[in-house]
């Protein structure tokens, strides 16, 4: 096959990582993660990273890339991922990209929007406003000036809410106006796990309780003890931002679990809608991919 990569996307808790792992074994290739939270070290349970055992079976890239307090964005991801894709292809293999961070996948396929340079001074001011008035205050502002992008990222994505406001203040243009869709810059076979919302909801509830059993609370405590504070982007990941108030005595464990489930369901719903709008082929199991690959050959 003359392609640059195979992409397996989909909502959280939809089984895409398991499918990608089995396909990687079948094709004797390597996996590139497209998950914005798996890049952070020491955050294993809450991000549902592949186990160390699986990472011994198959080479995984873009996992444990930076410390939780280090800056990481879509631009950095694309630069690193494209370099890895090239390295894997030079080995005569087809890389498999798997993840649910659709902004990463979109940027890989269509390139990065030509926006203004980062304005760190303005960014600090916006972060200060978020801390004083709440993130919802900034999100409502973003909805007024760029409803399209606001609905795409959701109300809890602090980093992207602030960046979008920063761009609008400096350019007078909404962030969504910068990203013009062109032909893909890579030739890929794209798939996405197409579970029903009801199936996703059941999986999310089951996985949340599994994370609690596996020690999510202890993982959060360790992060705080290492000095990785709540305000950091990494600590805004679903699972961590809900557990920290419980650890600090500001909420009950029941409330933390309920909030994790609610926020995960909302995020999964946005992911599901995004992937359904793509030209990717819907799948449910690895057999669906095998059948598709066979149909291309025969």
From Swiss-Prot:
KW Nucleotide-binding (keyword) present: yes
Catalyzed reactions: adenosine(37) in tRNA + dimethylallyl diphosphate = N(6)-dimethylallyladenosine(37) in tRNA + diphosphate
Gene Ontology biological-process annotations: tRNA modification
Cofactor(s) for this UniProt protein: Mg(2+)
Residue numbers binding substrate: 12-17
Residues in coiled coil: none
Residues under site feature: Interaction with substrate tRNA: 101, 123
GO function terms (MF aspect): ATP binding; tRNA dimethylallyltransferase activity
Domain of life: Bacteria
Keywords recorded for this protein, A-Z: ATP-binding, Magnesium, Nucleotide-binding, Transferase, tRNA processing
TM annotation in the entry: none
SUPFAM superfamilies documented for this protein: P-loop containing nucleoside triphosphate hydrolases
Documented EC number(s): 2.5.1.75
Record function comment: Catalyzes the transfer of a dimethylallyl group onto the adenine at position 37 in tRNAs that read codons beginning with uridine, leading to the formation of N6-(dimethylallyl)adenosine (i(6)A).
Family the entry assigns: Belongs to the IPP transferase family.
Subunit structure and binding partners: Monomer.
Designated name of the protein: tRNA dimethylallyltransferase
């Amino acid at each position: 096959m003359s392609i640059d990569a195979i992409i397996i996307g989909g909502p959280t808790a939809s089984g895409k990582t398991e499918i990608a792992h089995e396909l990687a074994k079948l094709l004797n290739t390597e996996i590139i993660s497209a998950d914005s939270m798996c890049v952070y070290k020491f955050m294993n349970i809450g991000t549902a990273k592949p186990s160390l055992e699986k990472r011994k079976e198959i080479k995984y890239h873009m996992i444990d890339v930076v410390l939780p307090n280090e800056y990481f964005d879509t631009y950095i991801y694309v630069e690193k991922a494209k370099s890895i894709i090239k390295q894997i292809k030079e080995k005569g293999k087809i890389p498999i990209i798997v993840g649910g961070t659709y902004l990463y996948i979109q940027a890989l396929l269509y390139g990065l929007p030509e926006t203004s340079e980062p304005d760190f001074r303005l960014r600090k001011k916006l972060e200060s406003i978020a801390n004083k008035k709440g993130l919802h205050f900034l999100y409502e502002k973003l909805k007024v000036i760029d409803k399209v992008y606001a609905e795409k990222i959701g109300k809890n994505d602090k980093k992207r809410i602030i960046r979008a406001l920063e761009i609008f203040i400096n350019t007078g243009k909404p962030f969504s106006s910068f990203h013009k869709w062109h032909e893909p810059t890579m030739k890929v076979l794209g798939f996405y796990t197409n579970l029903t919302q009801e199936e996703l909801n059941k999986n999310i509830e089951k996985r949340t309780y599994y994370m609690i059993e596996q020690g999510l609370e202890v993982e959060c405590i360790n992060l705080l003890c290492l000095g990785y504070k709540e305000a950091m982007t990494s600590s805004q990941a679903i699972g961590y931002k809900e557990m920290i108030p419980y650890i600090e005595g500001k909420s009950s464990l029941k409330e933390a679990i309920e909030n994790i489930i609610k926020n995960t369901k909302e995020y999964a719903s946005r992911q599901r809608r995004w992937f359904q709008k793509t030209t990717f082929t819907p799948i449910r199991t690895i057999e669906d991919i095998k059948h598709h690959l066979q149909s291309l050959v025969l």
